[in-house]
């Protein structure tokens, strides 16, 4: 840990090779670095699908992108992608690298880029393998500033660098053009701003997706009690779940799953009265846009991965979980467990009504 922040920092590389939710949380790190080093160029290493979002919203000054499908391909494909990635990074000559990815590949990249100041975790999330070394020369704690939420893992490098925490939660302002597009979309579907609930039924693993039939039942009950409208959002690979919800729900549900860019999705979420959905990237996007959240959790601990900075409720089935999907569930890995399937419709409806009535004792406005 440094006593004083490094000086003369002109170029910073943040390695965040995970998914959109992680990038949203990491945007708070970038914001604090921008406040400390207003003239520095902040570059993200990230998956190509997220590059335009980071650039458009000012989270990154520049992006070096990679294709995840190639990094998971043949050894030749991985080698070529890694070579192109490192070659592009070395041209930029960084003063500071921050390895949020904390992986074998990211440590190779940090070593090859070889910035003067290199921040990495001690201990790493997974133990180093034989013959693997930590290239960082500034070691940061797994969680910084006394926090337990994963956000504080991404903020921890600030503490190691001696940089103060001035922006404690992610906030991402939708772009004016995207807000105009969002309002036009709402108008086309006869939805009023702040009078609809954005619903996201997808997640990266099927076991983390609450059943579409239960979403439909919850939508019908919430509609009956509140009169609010519903808008289904999500990516192209989540269309099947959305169609099942539309088919099962008695209430009208507008379905735009697969039709929005990330930038437009952020703007749409910013117009919603509430976000209702699984633990996922769009949940963190909604919170960053300032929209209250009801996030549905299973084995994953909401205290570690829940929404931050907004009013929120995170209903969860009782634990320990009596497994109901032994053929699919891969406990104890929370990212591959099916515990959310045990979550009852009433608990979700009650959580939504509590947020809407602001009678939530444990509403989290900021960490």
Question: Which residues does each PLM region occupy?
Answer:
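Catalytic machinery of carbohydrate-active enzymes
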Residues: 1-367
């Amino acid at each position: 840990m440094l006593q004083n922040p490094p000086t003369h920092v002109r170029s910073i590389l943040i390695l965040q090779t995970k998914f959109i939710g992680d990038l949203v949380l990491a945007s708070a790190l970038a914001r604090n670095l921008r406040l400390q080093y207003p003239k520095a160029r902040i570059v993200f290493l990230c998956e190509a699908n997220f590059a335009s979002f980071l650039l458009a919203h000012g989270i990154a000054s520049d992006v070096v992108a990679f294709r995840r499908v190639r990094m998971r391909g043949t050894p030749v494909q991985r080698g070529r992608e890694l070579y192109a990635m490192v070659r592009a990074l070395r041209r930029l000559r960084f003063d500071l690298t921050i390895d949020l990815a904390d992986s074998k590949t990211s440590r190779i990249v940090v070593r090859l880029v070889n910035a003067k100041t290199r921040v990495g975790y001690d201990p790493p999330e997974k133990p180093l393998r034989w013959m693997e070394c930590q290239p960082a020369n500034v070691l940061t704690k797994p969680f910084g500033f006394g926090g337990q939420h994963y956000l504080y893992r991404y903020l921890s490098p600030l503490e190691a660098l001696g940089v103060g925490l001035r922006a404690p939660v992610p906030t991402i302002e939708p772009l004016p053009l995207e807000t105009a597009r969002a309002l036009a979309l709402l108008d086309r579907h006869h939805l009023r701003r702040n009078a609809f609930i954005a619903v996201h039924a997808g997640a990266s693993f099927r076991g983390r997706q609450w059943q579409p039939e239960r979403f439909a039942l919850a939508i019908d009950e919430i509609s009956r009690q509140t009169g609010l409208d519903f808008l289904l959002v999500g990516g192209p690979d989540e269309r099947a779940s959305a169609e099942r919800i539309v088919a099962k729900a008695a209430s009208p549900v507008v379905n735009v799953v697969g039709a929005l860019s990330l930038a437009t999705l952020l703007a749409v979420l910013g117009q919603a009265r509430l976000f209702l959905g699984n633990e996922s990237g769009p949940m963190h996007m909604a919170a960053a846009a300032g929209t209250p959240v009801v996030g549905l959790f299973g084995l994953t601990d909401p205290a570690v991965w829940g929404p931050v900075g907004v009013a929120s409720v995170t209903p969860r089935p009782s634990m320990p979980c009596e497994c109901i999907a032994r053929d699919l569930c891969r406990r104890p890995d929370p990212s591959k467990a099916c515990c959310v399937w045990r979550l009852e419709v009433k608990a979700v409806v009650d959580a939504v009504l509590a947020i809407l009535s602001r009678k939530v004792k444990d509403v989290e406005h900021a960490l």
